[in-house]
Amino acid sequence: KNIWSAGDCASLLFGGKRIRLESVQNAIDQAECVADNIVGNKREYSPHPWFWSDQYDTKLQIAGLNTGYNKIATRIGENSSVSYWYYRADKLLAVDAMNDPRCYMIGKRLIEMGKSPECELIEDINFDLKSLLET
């Protein structure tokens, strides 16, 4: 009891499995949760993982974890941008966005809100994804 760990290599339960989220943001979020618990503000750590990487002329931004997916929706954007939306059944698990910060931010917020839009809406380039955040 009263043993805590935090950092980018500390493991945690996520989706019923023990994993490590090796990212700076996760290390910061875990440390904040541990600090809250140390001072008596009891709370569980329930992360909404996100990552980014610059690979030459491509900015990759990831929200969520795509493990266990069985369906992918692809959204083709402008100027060679693209995003991949990963689902298990009808539940949105993750979004990988290449050079598409708008899709990344919308996907991240949808995951945080627990919303899972239909694949057909994601793939429809004429559909305004931002409208999904309003309901």
Regions found by a protein language model. Give the residues of each.
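Conserved catalytic motifs of the protein kinase core domain
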Residues: 2
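Mid-to-C-terminal Rossmann-like scaffold of FAD/NAD(P)H-dependent oxidoreductases
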Residues: 9-105
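Generic low-complexity, intrinsically disordered sequence content enriched
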Residues: 25-28, 114, 133
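Short, positively charged
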Residues: 61-67, 115, 119-122
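A short, polar/charged loop-to-alpha-helix boundary motif
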Residues: 101-120
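Cysteine/selenocysteine-centered motifs that mediate thiol-based redox chemistry or coordinate metal-sulfur cofactors
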Residues: 116-135
